[in-house]
């Protein structure tokens, strides 16, 4: 067997604290974060490395993220920041070691094995679907492992999946609309792969509820195709007024018990909304919410119902209040990944303590989190656009919050 050069010592990575000037009003400031070490070694070629005996094995939580991949580094950094924000509030927890010197497409399994050899008691990651698929193909997963994406697989006993699949939001929308006694749905979808996934998930859930899909519209950017689509003739419109002073009889009436589901991004939702009757119930996913900074632009979305995570819609929700926000401004998409990191840390603590059965559902910052067939599924909360701002339509719940299990505290 070829000899392998000894690994250089891990390099300490200093976390960035939350500052009073940058933190949102009411948000707690992060206490000093635990030391994070990032395994760095020469890697001239992307190939699996043999695992050698490690004389400095230290029990830790391994965080596998593609921080140096130009395509995923921004997302990985947001997840890491949220994960470490949660870790900073648990001084009794295991230290976190970040692993980023790998390619999720080629050698994520080798990096996973290296983390185990280095003493990882639990692993969080990988992040991409390809990386998760590669790990899911492994027959043996020796420690509790939380992959940050979902794939169709029959995983080993210790492997669990947790991500932000938009499909789940589409199913939640179907349930919300059904509870409003809406029985007919018109689906407007663009041709992007994500839009098609949203459409399929919504229609599947809607049909399982015994409700009707009355029309599907492929939207290609021309809103004029929507003219008159959601109305039926009003027979009273053809009758003459009793007196000249009578108010005019409307020409059209909105089809009763009908809703619209927008399987689109925010730009197309803005194009479509003016062509829909104001009182026609209209629903979408978090794809249409990019934050409340631009209320003037958001006016185009007034009246649209959607779902998103408490982290963005319920700032007074107890779990949201507990955790510090990023010291640097983040986009709405980055905030969602930051929140994913927070809940990932909370879930891995439950996995380490073997308390999943008694601790779920978790009142997470990403939503209510439950476990089904090795997949942590989250239920988003409902929101609506009003006066150019998105706001929650559900009051925050106040359950007792156990951030971290006492069973996992390190004893002096």
Where are the model-predicted features located?
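Segments of small-molecule ligand-sensing domains
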Residues: 325-394, 411-412
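Extracytoplasmic ligand/sensor domains, especially the bilobed periplasmic-binding protein
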Residues: 121-216, 289-291
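Structural motif
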Residues: 95-114, 169-172, 221-246
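Extracellular/periplasmic periplasmic-binding protein-like sensory domains
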Residues: 273-342, 356
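Extracellular/periplasmic bilobed ligand-binding domains
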Residues: 137-141, 184, 197-306
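Compositionally biased, proline/threonine/alanine/serine-rich low-complexity intrinsically disordered stretches
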Residues: 1-63, 72, 226-247, 379-382, ...
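Glycine- and acidic-residue-enriched helix-capping/strand-helix junction motifs
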Residues: 69-81, 194-196
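Signal peptide-proximal N-terminal region
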Residues: 79-98
């Amino acid at each position: 067997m070829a000899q392998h050069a000894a690994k250089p010592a891990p390099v300490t990575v200093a976390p960035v604290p939350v500052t009073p000037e940058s933190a949102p009003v009411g948000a707690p400031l992060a206490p000093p974060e635990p030391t994070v070490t990032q395994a760095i070694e020469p890697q001239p070629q992307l190939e699996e490395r043999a695992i050698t005996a490690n004389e400095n094995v230290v029990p830790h939580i391994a965080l596998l993220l593609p921080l140096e991949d130009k395509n995923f580094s921004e997302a990985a950094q947001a997840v890491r920041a949220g994960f470490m924000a949660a870790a900073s509030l648990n001084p009794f927890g295991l230290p976190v070691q970040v692993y980023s010197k790998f390619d999720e497409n080629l050698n994520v399994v080798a990096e996973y094995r290296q983390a185990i050899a280095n003493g990882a008691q639990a692993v969080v990651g990988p992040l991409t679907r390809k990386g998760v698929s590669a790990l899911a193909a492994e027959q043996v997963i020796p420690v509790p492992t939380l992959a940050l994406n979902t794939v169709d697989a029959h995983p080993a006993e210790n492997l669990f999946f947790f991500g932000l699949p938009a499909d789940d939001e589409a199913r939640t929308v179907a349930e919300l609309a059904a509870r409003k006694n809406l029985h007919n749905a018109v689906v407007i979808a663009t041709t992007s792969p994500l839009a098609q996934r949203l459409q399929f998930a919504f229609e599947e859930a809607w049909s399982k509820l015994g409700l009707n899909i009355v029309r599907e519209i492929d939207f290609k950017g021309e809103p004029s195709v929507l003219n008159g689509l959601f109305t039926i003739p009003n027979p009273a419109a053809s009758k003459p007024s009793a007196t000249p002073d009578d108010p005019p009889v409307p020409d059209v009436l909105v089809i009763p018990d009908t809703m619209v589901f927008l399987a689109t991004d925010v730009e197309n939702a803005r194009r479509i909304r003016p062509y829909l009757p104001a009182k026609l119930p209209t629903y979408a996913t978090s794809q249409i919410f990019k934050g409340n900074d631009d209320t003037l632009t958001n006016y185009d979305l007034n009246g649209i119902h959607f779902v998103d995570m408490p982290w963005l819609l319920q700032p007074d929700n107890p779990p949201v209040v507990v955790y510090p926000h990023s010291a640097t401004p983040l986009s709405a998409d980055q905030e969602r990944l930051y929140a994913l990191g927070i809940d990932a840390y909370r879930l891995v603590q439950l996995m380490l303590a073997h308390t999943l059965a008694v601790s779920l559902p978790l009142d997470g910052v990403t939503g209510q989190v439950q476990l089904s067939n090795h997949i942590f599924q989250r239920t988003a909360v409902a929101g609506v656009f009003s006066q150019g701002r998105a706001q929650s339509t559900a009051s925050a719940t106040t359950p007792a919050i156990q951030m971290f299990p006492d069973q996992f505290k390190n004893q002096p």
